[in-house]
């Protein structure tokens, strides 16, 4: 049965629908939480929070948050961490991904930075692309100024959303070409599309 029809039948029958829950712990304090909280989900709740720390420190913090919430009776259906390679050492980045997965988290990583996911909404970029170029490129492509400090406005989210399927396809194409087990060497790439695909199931 179509999931939307199922949800409608559930509401008609008077049975309260149990929503899926997402815990999304992000490296950035503005851009990433703004973006994920902007998804208009009908059958899921999202707790996306930024911590201002990266790789191993972020994963340790995420584990602590999940455990603290569990003690309060909050258990999430999906747990995610979102972080960037930036200039962190290769071993730190790869170890953070492994530690997250060992503790029940899925990982949406970007090499070098989260904004690479935004760029893929417009074009397929292959090969190394330094993050210092992202803001200027995005401002040109969007037609209005973007800065990492400003976060994701509703105007920006609405500009990106219609191009989302293209971004997913571009990200998948890149990941297939790398095909290895060393994320720190996969420049430029992102697995943010994996989290986006999960969120899209609950639109």
Regions found by a protein language model. Give the residues of each.
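Alpha-helical scaffolding within the catalytic cores
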Residues: 61-68
């Amino acid at each position: 049965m179509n999931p939307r029809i199922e949800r409608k039948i559930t509401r008609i029958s008077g049975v309260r629908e149990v929503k899926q829950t997402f815990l999304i712990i992000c490296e950035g304090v503005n851009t990433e939480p703004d973006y994920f909280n902007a998804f208009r989900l009908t059958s899921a709740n999202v707790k996306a929070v930024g911590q201002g720390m990266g790789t191993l420190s972020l994963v340790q913090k995420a584990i602590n948050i999940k455990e603290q919430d569990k003690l309060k009776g909050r258990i999430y259906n999906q747990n995610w961490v979102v972080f960037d390679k930036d200039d962190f050492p290769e071993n730190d980045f790869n170890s953070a991904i492994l530690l997250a997965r060992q503790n029940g988290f899925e990982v949406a990583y970007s090499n070098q930075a989260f904004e690479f996911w935004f760029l893929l909404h417009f074009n397929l970029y292959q090969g190394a692309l330094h993050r210092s170029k992202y803001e200027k490129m995005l401002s040109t492509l969007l037609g209005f100024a973007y800065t990492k400090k400003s976060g994701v406005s509703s105007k920006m989210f609405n500009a990106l959303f219609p191009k989302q399927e293209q971004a997913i396809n571009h990200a998948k194409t890149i990941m297939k070409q790398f095909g290895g087990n060393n994320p720190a060497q996969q420049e430029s790439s992102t697995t943010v599309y994996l989290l986006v695909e999960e969120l899209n199931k609950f639109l």
